[in-house]
Amino acid sequence: MKKYNLISAQTRIFESPLKERPFKVAIEKKAAEINLVNLRDYAIDSYGTIDGKPFGGGVGMILRPEPIYSALLDLYGSDEKILDTKVSSTKKIVVLDPAGPKWNQNKAKEYSKLEEITFICGRYEGIDQRVVDLFASETVSLGEFVASGGELPALVILETILRLDENVLEKPEATELESYSNDSTTEHPQYTRPEEFKNLLVPKVLLSGDHKKIKEWKKSNSK
C-alpha cells in the first residue's frame, strides 16, 4: 500500500475531495493510505500559533518551521529518519512552491512508483525557507500562478499519481491513450451523440467503422 501524508494548516480543504473518486477508490481498495496532518496540532503555544511575520518586512504571515518540523518528527520518528526520507529513492518529502519545477505527466509516473510521499502545503505568504533547505526532497509547482495555499495543488498532483495505479481506475489501459501518456502530445478531439449539434457534425471518419482510418485521424489530430 502506498502512503501519502498531507501536512497543512487547513486540512478541512481535503475532507470533501477525499470522499470522491479516485481518492475514495484508492482508499477503499487499500491501494493508498492518505493521512491528513494538521499543523494546528503542532502549534508552538496554547494560542495555536503556527506562523509569524516575515523578517525584513512584507505583507502577510509565514508558516514557522517548528510546527512543520514537529509534524515530520511525528511521522518519521527521528531527525535521522527525516533525512533518510529526504534522500531516499523510494520516498519523498515535497514542498508545494510556485517557484518550483512544473509538474507534468512524467513526474506523475515517477511519483506513482514511490512508496511514500509527504506533501507540505504552504499557506498565507509561504513557508520559512529553512523547511525547504533542511527537509524537502524537492519542490513542485503546478505552474506560473499563485494560489492561497498548497492544498489544492497537492490534491491535483495526488490525483494524477493515484489514477496511474491499476487498482484505482476501472479501465487502467485508458491511461495509455490519454494526453501526455507516451509523448508530449495531447489527445485528439472527442465526440459523442448526437451526430449533429447546432449545425456542427461529428467527423465522418469516426462514423465510418474503418479502424485504420480512424486511427490515422486520431493520430493526425493529436496536438
What is each stretch, according to the model?
Residues 62-121:
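S-adenosyl-L-methionine/SAH cofactor-binding core of RNA-modifying enzymes
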Residues 1, 83, 190-223:
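SAM-dependent methyltransferases
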Residues 131-170, 180:
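Structured adenosyl-cofactor binding patch, chiefly the S-adenosyl-L-methionine
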Residues 5-7, 35-37, 94, 117-118, ...:
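Hydrophobic/aromatic beta-strand patches that form the interior of the parallel beta-sheet core
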Residues 1-76, 212-214, 219-221:
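N-terminal nucleotide/polyanion-binding subdomain common to many enzyme families
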Residues 21-25, 109-113, 134-135:
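Short, solvent-exposed amphipathic alpha-helical segments in soluble enzyme
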